[in-house]
C-alpha cells in the first residue's frame, strides 16, 4: 500500500474520514482524541497507553471512543488510566485499582466488582463487619 491508502484506511478505522481535510485544531475534542490514538497507531506501537481517554466527553462521544478503543485493542495491548468505572469495566480484561497511590486489587472485572475493598473505596458500599 502507498501512504495515501494507509492514511485513508486509518482514517476509516478511526471514523475520521469525514474530517480528513480539516486542520486538527478545528476538530471536536472527541475527534482530536481519536486522532491522537491514530497517530500512535501509525507509529507502529504494539502497546499503547491511554490516559483518561474519555475525560471531558459527552455520553455519545464516550460510547464512540469505547467502540474505537475496543476495536484497536484487538491487535494491540492497551494500558488505560481511567476514573470512569463504567468505561473501565466495559473495556478491561484485567483491572488494577489504586487508592491513594497503592494497588488494592488486581483482577478480572468480575472479581474487582466483588472485591470488598474496591466496593468501599469506589462504589460507596460498606458491608457489616
Language-model features and meaning:
Residues 1-129:
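Glycine-rich phosphate-binding loops of nucleotide-dependent enzymes
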